Swiss-Prot record:
GO CC entries: membrane
Source lineage: Eukaryota, Fungi, Dikarya, Basidiomycota, Agaricomycotina
pH dependence: Optimum pH is 8.0.
GO molecular function, one term: oxidoreductase activity
Stretches of the chain forming a coiled coil according to its record: none
Glycosylation sites per record: N4
Protein's cellular compartments: Membrane
Keywords for the protein's UniProt record, in alphabetical order: Glycoprotein, Membrane, Oxidoreductase, Transmembrane, Transmembrane helix
Name of the protein described by the UniProt record: Luciferase
EC top class, as a word: oxidoreductase
Gene name of this polypeptide: luz
Uses in industry and biotechnology: The availability of a complete eukaryotic luciferin biosynthesis pathway provides several applications in biomedicine and bioengineering.
EC code(s) of this entry: 1.-.-.-
């Protein structure tokens, strides 16, 4: 009886609604039914990428979704020729073998495919690449926790080096926007990297298939500078050497090493 009364009451209320109100109500219910599974899957993907600058909860997911409204194109090369820096610190790279890996759709960049072998990562990459490269530049850099990825170890420009003089550090705007951060590796997750590259070096990296720009990197966007680049995880020792070359070039650009000092091999 109680169920019948409740249903009767519901039908009575619906009968008093206008056709427009009923259509709107049905539309909202239908849209919610369609959107909920999509949002649920997307939220699960957000959690699977692991720790980042966003909290690992629904609040962090909302932050990421809002920032995604500012997403930029990530693989075009023309943008680099519009930047003032024309020097290079990186030698010509070989083409990366195979196709590009699939990347998460969020602004938190992580690889979904072509994942690195865990044994190789433990032996050659995790807590090794970033410290090893930085150890060759202790006069200008230091290691600390990333300003972008709070679980990653990063290379920074020393605080004692001034960055407000373009004659001293031509990359001063890039250095300022990254808060002196040069490079970090997500070695707690998939061993991909983020780092700052001179425009022509970034162009070389993208052209040869080794990475892509950060989705928020670009002029007029509330994010990292255009030079902020995402590198795919190295899958073997040869690719690891190329990645170290690229990190070396990043340090050369951000510390204003002589432009003629082209990085060809990690030593």
């Amino acid at each position: 009886m109680r169920i019948n009364i409740s249903l009767s009451s519901l039908f009575e209320r619906l009968s008093k609604l206008s056709s427009r109100s009923i259509a709107i109500t049905c539309g909202v219910v239908l849209a919610s039914a369609i959107a909920f599974p999509i949002i649920r899957r997307d939220y699960q993907t957000f959690l699977e990428v692991g720790p980042s600058y966003a909290p690992q909860n629904f609040r962090g997911y909302i932050i990421v979704c809002v920032l995604s409204l500012f997403r930029q194109e990530q693989k075009g090369l023309a943008i680099y020729d519009r930047l003032p820096e024309k020097r290079r610190w990186l030698a010509d790279l070989p083409f990366r073998e195979g196709t590009r890996p699939s990347i998460t759709s969020h602004i938190i960049q992580r690889q979904r495919t072509q994942l690195v072998d865990q044994e190789f990562a433990t032996r050659e990459l995790i807590d090794k690449v970033i410290p090893r490269v930085q150890a060759r530049h202790t006069d200008k850099t230091f290691l600390s926790t990333s300003k972008f990825e709070f679980h990653a170890k990063a290379i920074f420009l020393l605080p004692s080096i001034p960055i407000n003089d373009p004659l001293n550090i031509p990359s001063h705007d890039t250095v300022r926007r990254t808060k002196r951060e040069i490079a970090h590796m997500h070695d707690y997750h998939d061993c991909t990297l983020h780092l700052a590259l001179a425009a022509q070096d970034g162009k070389e990296v993208l052209k040869k298939g080794w990475g892509q720009r950060h989705p928020l990197a670009g002029p007029g966007v509330p994010g990292p500078p255009t030079e902020w680049t995402f590198l795919y995880a190295p899958r073997n020792e040869e690719e690891a050497r190329v990645v170290e070359m690229i990190v070396e070039a990043s340090i050369g650009y951000m510390t204003n090493d002589p432009a003629g000092k082209i990085v060809e091999n990690a030593k």
